Amino acid sequence: MIKYAKKEYSKEEVLKVLNPLVAEWFKSKFEDLTPPQKLAIIPIYKKENVLISSPTGSGKTLTAFLTIISELLNLSMKNSLENKVYAVYISPLRALNNDIYRNLEEPLHEIKSLATERGLEINIRHAVRTGDTPSSERQRMLKKTPHILITTPETLAIILVAPKFREKLRGVKWIIVDEIHSLAESKRGVHLSLSLERLEELADTSPIRIGLSATINPLEEVARFLVGYDDQGRPRNCTIVDTRYMKRKSIKVISPVTDLIYIPAEELSKKLYEKIYEIVERHRTTLIFTNTRSGTERVVFHLKQLAKSKGTLKEEQIAAHHGSLSRNVRHDVEKKLKNGELKAIVSSTSLELGIDIGYIDVVVQIGSPKSVTRCLQRIGRSGHKLHEISKGVLICVDRDDLVEDAVMIKEAYRHHLDKIHIPRKALDVLAQHIVGMAIERKWKVDDALKVIRRSHCYRDLSKNEFLRVLKYLSGKYSTLEHHRVYGKIWWDEEAGEFGRRGKYIRVIYTLNLGTIPDEVDVKVYTVTGKYVGNIEEEFLERLIPGDRFVLGGKVYEFVTSRGFKAFVKPAFEQKPTIPSWFSEMLPLSYDLAIKIGKFRHQMFKWISEGKSPERIKSYVIKECKADKNAAEAIYR
């Protein structure tokens, strides 16, 4: 049964159920509980599955971990803490995993110090395991297994078939899925849902599932995605903690010019960057979102040019952050941001999720973020603390984006969120997991189908559809052999069983697992050997020695290339090229598109009825939080 948490527990009631050391630590750090903590900690303590939806800075991550740390502490104090994984934390980003690791360090270290003062010895281990984890570290995890394992969906699927480490997962009691809203509507989420059911099957007892999400809709659907179904087809129990609208916000849409229609593109571009620069000057730290990596590089370059000409900001106070920059470059930017060394940071999507980046007092969105949910997620990065206002400015440079943003803000203030659409019955993902299950052990067909149907994404999978995938994977389509596609499993139709085929299938599985498309990237190095980031092969083909381009907000001169490596040197002469990256467009959400159509219809109706321009523009200013320039452009 899916239900909503209604009862808010007092601080005393919550701390009473926690280990005394955890309670003492909490009281020394926080004056009171946040709304999600008042609603969620007791249900987690009572071993209920919980979905928490709340804005950034509301303490939902700590909410998830408090009970877990408390229970592990109880076991440690009884000398009952075994060498196995008790809690699995899953997030879509490696950077977020590293962030959580660092954020757990402080409470675990401070609680350990409190225990030492009382003559108690505790040792709760936590570790990150992703594709970046060295093999030596993975080997160490077998000997000293982390009690809290921090990982990604893809790595979880890999360790489920790791012969030795999978045994460490049998004792898992808690599973935390962070940023579940970003996973649920993609095939990565479908992939994860099957991994969770395979982990459920492996574990000695049914693990408690905790989902953490920013603003999302509908919550009941996401809850069913998180917890799955029992063998009778009923949703497992889940308590929803809905604190989505607890934080105040201030969002407005503006146009940098009075006339968006006839102004020359060059003049519009100039006014845009001047407006952004003006906002950056007025605020302590500004986070600027573009919708593409190319846009990020372009904005950083022009802001640095303005800083150089005006002299009111230093060029090094402006930085870029996106997925095509090297990990070291991104970490350096994040560190500077946390330390308050940056006035402006420009990102495409890489800072959308909950990475801890310190204090942001305003978010600027250039163009349309294409959905109400994404808009609120981005704006929510400002005013990180609970009592602060999330402040956002949406700047538009064409009328279509302007209308999108105006409608988006109107819907955001009315709490009308886009509905999430969770993919169903993705057979390519199913094929991967059938191979993974075959690697684990020999399966009865009906038993395997039962496990798969527990996933929300496959609850409607028919047996015939399942058998067709088995037929494909077992190589029974003889025509595929002409294309060198061979069977990965064996399937005995009479016995109703299947299992792994060949000794290399584990390698094939781990190398081809996941749903993130492969990108053929060219790695960019300085001539001194420093890794800067990636560019597309197509962009490299257009470069000749001496060409200049921007990467990470810095200008480089192309020297030469060898294979998929490009070598560059810093350049100081300007007029560089902006690299382009493939598949960068964000899709417009269906629900928002419908609302935009209705808004345009209403505008046309009022104009045809002879409603005065002043009244129409006044409506846009009031309801859509638009400035006069934006209202004028929408009317025209």
List where the protein language model places each region:
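Phosphate-interacting basic helix/loop segments used at nucleotide- and nucleic-acid interfaces
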Residues: L272-K275, L337-K338, L342-A344, S348, ...
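Terminal, basic amphipathic appendages of nucleotide-handling enzymes
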Residues: Y9, E24, R414, E519, ...
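Conserved nucleotide-binding/hydrolysis modules and their immediate coupling elements
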Residues: G475, E481-H601
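The conserved Walker
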Residues: S54-T56
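Ser/Thr-centered flexible coil motifs
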Residues: N19, T34, A265, S326, ...
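Conserved lysine of the Walker
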Residues: K60-T61
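Pre-P-loop entry segment of helicase/translocase ATPase cores
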Residues: M1-P36
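Helicase motor core with emphasis on the C-terminal RecA-like subdomain
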Residues: K6, K11, L21-V22, K38-L39, ...
